[in-house]
Amino acid sequence: MVSFFKTPIFILIIFLYLNEKVICSINENQNENDTISQNVNQHENINQNVNDNDNIEQLKSMIGNDELHKNLTILEKLILESLEKDKLKYPLLKQGTEQLIDISKFNKKNITDADDETYIIPTVQSTFHDIVKYEHLIKEQSIEIYNSDISDKIKKKIFIVRTLKTIKLMLIPLNSYKQNNDLKSALEELNNVFTNKEAQEESSPIGDHGTFFRKLLTHVRTIKENEDIENKGETLILGDNKIDVMNSNDFFFTTNSNVKFMENLDDITNQYGLGLINHLGPHLIALGHFTVLKLALKNYKNYFEAKSIKFFSWQKILEFSMSDRFKVLDMMCDHESVYYSEKKRRKTYLKVDRSNTSMECNILEYLLHYFNKYQLEIIKTTQDTDFDLHGMMEHKYIKDYFFSFMCNDPKECIIYHTNQFKKEANEENTFPEQEEPNRQISAFNLYLNYYYFMKRYSSYGVKKTLYVHLLNLTGLLNYDTRAYVTSLYLPGYYNAVEMSFTEEKEFSKLFESLIQCIEKCHSDQARQISKDSNLLNNITKCDLCKGAFLYANMKFDEVPSMLQKFYVYLTKGLKIQKVSSLIKTLDIYQDYSNYLSHDINWYTFLFLFRLTSFKEIAKKNVAEAMYLNIKDEDTFNKTVVTNYWYPSPIKKYYTLYVRKHIPNNLVDELEKLMKSGTLEKMKKSLTFLVHVNSFLQLDFFHQLNEPPLGLPRSYPLSLVLEHKFKEWMNSSPAGFYFSNYQNPYIRKDLHDKVLSQKFEPPKMNQWNKVLKSLIECAYDMYFEQRHVKNLYKYHNIYNINNKLMLMRDSIDLYKNNFDDVLFFADIFNMRKYMTATPVYKKVKDRVYHTLHSITGNSVNFYKYGIIYGFKVNKEILKEVVDELYSIYNFNTDIFTDTSFLQTVYLLFRRIEETYRTQRRDDKISVNNVFFMNVANNYSKLNKEEREIEIHNSMASRYYAKTMFAAFQMLFSTMLSNNVDNLDKAYGLSENIQVATSTSAFLTFAYVYNGSIMDSVTNSLLPPYAKKPITQLKYGKTFVFSNYFMLASKMYDMLNYKNLSLLCEYQAVASANFYSAKKVGQFLGRKFLPITTYFLVMRISWTHAFTTGQHLISAFGSPSSTANGKSNASGYKSPESFFFTHGLAAEASKYLFFYFFTNLYLDAYKSFPGGFGPAIKEQTQHVQEQTYERKPSVHSFNRNFFMELVNGFMYAFCFFAISQMYAYFENINFYITSNFRFLDRYYGVFNKYFINYAIIKLKEITSDLLIKYEREAYLSMKKYGYLGEVIAARLSPKDKIMNYVHETNEDIMSNLRRYDMENAFKNKMSTYVDDFAFFDDCGKNEQFLNERCDYCPVIEEVEETQLFTTTGDKNTNKTTEIKKQTSTYIDTEKMNEADSADSDDEKDSDTPDDELMISRFH
């Protein structure tokens, strides 16, 4: 131990030692850091070298790639061979052809041996310029010989010649690098192709460009200022010439048969630096490839000498994910801001100044954006097939999924040989059947893919065309060079330009944007145009706008220009004004059915027109204008049809007004626009299954049904179904919502489940199985009636009553199509349709309905409705809606969205009238009133004929309403541009819980995203569909839930999976909320006079608190008023506006009653079935002598009025002590609750703030007592239960002992246990035992766990006697006992033997005893 005096010396030594260690440690760390920094610098140098080399390697992969060169050469030879063998022997060698092209580089072939006509085909020696001229010749002669029979052949030839021209251009730098091994010289040689020195000496076809555009702008200004010209946009395009609809040849080709004009177009585009676009077209792969090469040449020093900027090949860029492609582009274009995937590219791009971005980067931005969109569109379209992909999957998994689906294995196979590909049999199969697809040859084999393209592509249907493009896409995404080369001839990469026309603007408006761009350029600068498309030249936006204008407007010999042809085709041929209307009907991966495919220059025209027709193109660069243009895609297209917040009364009356004023011939025009077989498809879209009369027998006529013997008369089926929904709603706040729906009694055990940590997920999507058991039970009880049983079971069904046969057919159809059946309803108002009803009764009913509705709503006005079941044939319905939707898009100048919907409804009414062959003309006919309008010999028909009779009978009255409801759901969804975003929103992890929430309607996400409940009632369904879900007392919630299920099916048809699940899961919760809301709203508005009276009183008191004088003297107290003058000093108390101390004592009385009513209303928190039913559980063994109480529905019952009293007590308590809070609730009553939009958001606010405060108040008041009651109840129940079990188990043993003691006391102590039981063998004991188990039993207490419900005792026998026959009755004389068998019986095995009976009871979906009556079998 260190002494006190030595302590300072010891501390000094310790300090010096630590100091030395610290210094050494610092030195060591410094040395380590130096070493690390050296290593880091070394690694950075290595990485720098790698990055430097990587730039060069990326360029080499484009112009020094042996594999790419090899594949391009192979495809070139395949194309040359196919041109030689092509059935279309063109172009012919005519007089003057040799002056156009160098014949020495072409092969000449005779068409036939006997014919002197010769056609020419290119060779390997043909250059790029030779193929350009060859393409001109083909187009010239194709226009001359065109007819519909050779249309596909022309398209195919034009595609492969354009592909050959692209290959020739791609091979130029590849061949150069192969010869010279110099990257820059290879790029320069490519550049030489577009450097045309001879063009400088030639005169331009439009003369001086500056003068031309000056005159153009003057002409435009004159037209705009001329008030006499009505359609200025059309005049700008067509001029003074009124062009009528032209021949198909003029539509299909951009130019007429004039090679000189084609060359002029090439020269114009070259002069403005657009040569690449002109020769390649908007092919996403080819144009991107050469744009990257152009960028490499322009920035060669930065990319490959200074190496300060990263460089990537186009093929490598496409290999990245959709978000990373933009990161790479930013790195290549040396942008300061790099894109991150957390935000949309549009938002991040527009935040940074991009005004100095080169045109090449702008075009690459456009190409990447629409390649991503193309990729998503292809993947989205797979949802129509049997396998699903999603856009965020890794590329490897997309490939694996695709081949797993096509080949049943992730390994590659030739998809054309698979059974999956052959399902769409629109082609002749020349290959033998194979059990296993060929995996030795790659799926991306150039020869096979090109062979199938040339041989069969034109005959492919939608799915096969999709598979071909998806195969190529998987190769591109996984950096397969063969797929990169194969993409050059696929039409989908040209058609992608169509996706960019999304705005709902007229074509002439888009053209005005191009004119504005030219005006801006002309006023800002007078720039001399370049004379070629030199890749080193900087192309400006002005070059692009002017070049695009000249390309689209050039013409010769008064032949219409491309722009004029396209405009006439839209406005007069198709009779539409918007390009987007045309594009929406075209598929991006489609085959030769697209008319644009006759001439690829149509795609070039659309591409150049698209780049220069964005709204902000005059002020922004191309990419900025593009992103600003698609900004509108994020906004909701709000119309009367799609806007779910639109006031429903206004919407209803507007809809009826439009229907009433639709021209009579508009329906006829719609029929003419449809295909010939569409009307038959409309008839097949729905199949009615459950007949109205069948449901009415169990509902409206339930009192006429004979009750089963010993049981009460059954309640109406719609009442039972409605009660079930309300019961689910009442159980949901306690956490018992849909938990184990098969057994409603399971909620008694849920507290024990929580303690045992056993989780049972709610089965929310199987709620209809419970309803199925209720419906089947009701039908079974009907068939158990004595007279029905005698007719149906014990007599020949040949002479059976039509009504009984209809009942049996309806339930059979329902059972067989249970998963697809939907139930709709209509109002059942007999007096309205019966001519014998006196007029005064009709007037009386109308007045009563008005009085019932005017101060609230029409909730529960009718008890019963007309309920029927049907199923939707989704495939046929989808085809019908697609056709009608395309008709609408093509004819927006004729139809608005509302008028088109009502025209379709009138068309459905016409179809409905074709079913009315059996209906009587008089309205009073019972057949018409109760829909028994089936054939008189209905019961004698066979099953198929009876099903047709049911369908025709129901369709004669309800086809139009039912079909139109399904159609409007699909049409309004397709019309809205918000559904895509909404589906994505509900796919997010934070919103998935909203779909499964039992109170989703009170969550902000549910309301903010559009409240699917309001979407169903006010957007997806027509106005008449709201009647049954409001006015029916029995069945309204059941019907509304079926509306949700129909919406789920419709969303699923449109591949909105998340919205489909949302509707499916909310079919019960939201439907219940709507019904309860309507009932509360109905009664709440009845208190308008009372609420107004108290509001006036409150205003007067507020005036008194602030000024000291009442605004209305009548509300002042008599003691404070003298001679009609108020005493100001007695009232003035401004702080009372927030809290009134004087009324606190009075309010406490109401607080007590509020507390008391909470005990009753909140009992479910601890007692799932309520406190009363919980007490009854103790007496379940006692048979009740009374019938069950009538099931409750969403109406004015005991609980409702108790809640009303609770609300009054709450108001009298808190409104009195705080006027500020009272005014807040008054605002809600008068304003918020009367506007649906405000009411939904207020509900969310009320849940998170006001209700939260109420819940906290309850936690310290009523909830404490309820919890205490629960604990006391469980304690008493457990004590009594244990006592009963112990007594029940001891009772049989006591009886045995008593019996033996009474019969033979002398031998009682000598008897063994089985002797006692043998003595008691003729007795049996039965007791109630719920299989409780006693823990920690001692040896003397083990008998407590020995239990049996029914224990018969068998006399002991010898083991040898077990095999004796029953006739050996004297064997008991044997005295020798070898081994005795046990006299105890294994009751569990006995129960297993009787499992056939017990299993039926265990597995049956027995419904609640408050609702159901046991079946009789």
From Swiss-Prot:
<keyword id="KW-1015">Disulfide bond</keyword>
<keyword id="KW-0472">Membrane</keyword>
<feature type="transmembrane region" description="Helical">
    <location>
        <begin position="1204"/>
        <end position="1224"/>
    </location>
</feature>
<dbReference type="Pfam" id="PF03805">
    <property type="entry name" value="CLAG"/>
</dbReference>
<dbReference type="GO" id="GO:0020008">
    <property type="term" value="C:rhoptry"/>
</dbReference>
<feature type="disulfide bond">
    <location>
        <begin position="517"/>
        <end position="545"/>
    </location>
</feature>
<keyword id="KW-1133">Transmembrane helix</keyword>
<dbReference type="GO" id="GO:0020002">
    <property type="term" value="C:host cell plasma membrane"/>
</dbReference>
<dbReference type="GO" id="GO:0020035">
    <property type="term" value="P:adhesion of symbiont to microvasculature"/>
</dbReference>
<dbReference type="GO" id="GO:0050839">
    <property type="term" value="F:cell adhesion molecule binding"/>
</dbReference>
<keyword id="KW-0732">Signal</keyword>
<protein>
    <recommendedName>
        <fullName>Cytoadherence-linked asexual protein 3.1</fullName>
    </recommendedName>
</protein>
<dbReference type="GO" id="GO:0031410">
    <property type="term" value="C:cytoplasmic vesicle"/>
</dbReference>
<dbReference type="GO" id="GO:0030430">
    <property type="term" value="C:host cell cytoplasm"/>
</dbReference>
<keyword id="KW-1032">Host cell membrane</keyword>
<feature type="disulfide bond">
    <location>
        <begin position="407"/>
        <end position="413"/>
    </location>
</feature>
<keyword id="KW-1035">Host cytoplasm</keyword>
<keyword id="KW-0968">Cytoplasmic vesicle</keyword>
<comment type="subunit">
    <text>Self-associates. Component of the RhopH complex. RhopH complex is at least composed of CLAG3.1/CLAG3.2, RhopH2 and RhopH3 with a 1:1:1 subunit stoichiometry. CLAG3.1/CLAG3.2 mediates subunit association through independent contacts with RhopH2 and RhopH3, which do not directly interact with one another. Interacts with RhopH2. Interacts with RhopH3.</text>
</comment>
<feature type="signal peptide">
    <location>
        <begin position="1"/>
        <end position="24"/>
    </location>
</feature>
<feature type="region of interest" description="Disordered">
    <location>
        <begin position="1383"/>
        <end position="1417"/>
    </location>
</feature>
<comment type="function">
    <text>Participates in the formation of new permeability pathways in Plasmodium-infected erythrocytes enabling the uptake of nutrients from the blood plasma.</text>
</comment>
<keyword id="KW-0812">Transmembrane</keyword>
<keyword id="KW-0813">Transport</keyword>
<feature type="disulfide bond">
    <location>
        <begin position="521"/>
        <end position="542"/>
    </location>
</feature>
<feature type="compositionally biased region" description="Acidic residues">
    <location>
        <begin position="1394"/>
        <end position="1411"/>
    </location>
</feature>
<dbReference type="InterPro" id="IPR005553">
    <property type="entry name" value="CLAG"/>
</dbReference>
<feature type="disulfide bond">
    <location>
        <begin position="333"/>
        <end position="361"/>
    </location>
</feature>
<dbReference type="GO" id="GO:0016020">
    <property type="term" value="C:membrane"/>
</dbReference>
<keyword id="KW-1043">Host membrane</keyword>
